[in-house]
Swiss-Prot record:
The lineage of its organism: Bacteria, Pseudomonadati, Thermodesulfobacteriota, Desulfuromonadia, Geobacterales. PANTHER family: DEOXYURIDINE 5'-TRIPHOSPHATE NUCLEOTIDOHYDROLASE. One of its GO terms (biological process) is dUTP catabolic process. It comes from Geotalea daltonii (strain DSM 22248 / JCM 15807 / FRC-32). Keywords: Hydrolase, Magnesium, Metal-binding, Nucleotide metabolism. It catalyses: dUTP + H2O = dUMP + diphosphate + H(+). Substrate binds at R69, S70, G71, N82, T86, I87, D88. This is Deoxyuridine 5'-triphosphate nucleotidohydrolase.
Length: 149
């Protein structure tokens, strides 16, 4: 299993909120917790930015992906609007999670509640070549369900 060193800063250290952590030995992502002064009620169809109380410094060549938690999605219809969200290596601000309630009931988010997961990944940057034509393939321009439903 590979690992990288990630510097982490607590935005409000006096609150003593937990740092992200892996919940199982083989988990790909760490859980991110809400950093709230009071409970937040998310009505059906409503979205909001939830602070996490942390900022990170990633090594060059890496990104962090913010993803929904499957249990919240299945049980409550809670997801992320921009999924996955991307944290770039040069971003130093507080990580915020844009949460949306796709469920039928209001959803209460409490301080320290696990609201999303963060996965670290290397990335490759493209060097674009401006061309007049692209190579032919059997698929061609077919897309958006052209192979079936």
């Amino acid at each position: 299993m590979n690992s990288i060193n990630v510097k982490i800063k607590r935005i409000r250290p006096e609150k003593g909120n937990p740092l992200p952590r892996y919940m199982t030995a083989h988990a790909a992502g760490v859980d991110l917790c809400a950093d709230l002064d009071q409970e937040l009620v998310l009505e059906p169809g409503e979205r909001t930015l939830v602070p996490t109380g942390i900022a990170i410094e990633l090594p060059e060549g890496y990104e962090a992906q913010i993803r929904p938690r499957s249990g919240l999605a299945l049980k409550h219809g809670i997801s992320l609007v921009n999924s996955p969200g991307t944290i770039d290596a040069d971003y130093r601000g507080e990580i915020g999670v844009i949460v949306i309630n796709h469920g039928n009931e209001p959803f209460v988010i409490s301080n320290n509640e696990r609201i999303a997961q963060m996965v670290f990944a290397p990335f490759t940057r493209a060097v674009f070549q401006d061309v007049a034509e692209l190579g032919e393939t059997a698929r061609g321009e077919g897309g958006f369900g052209h192979t079936g439903r």
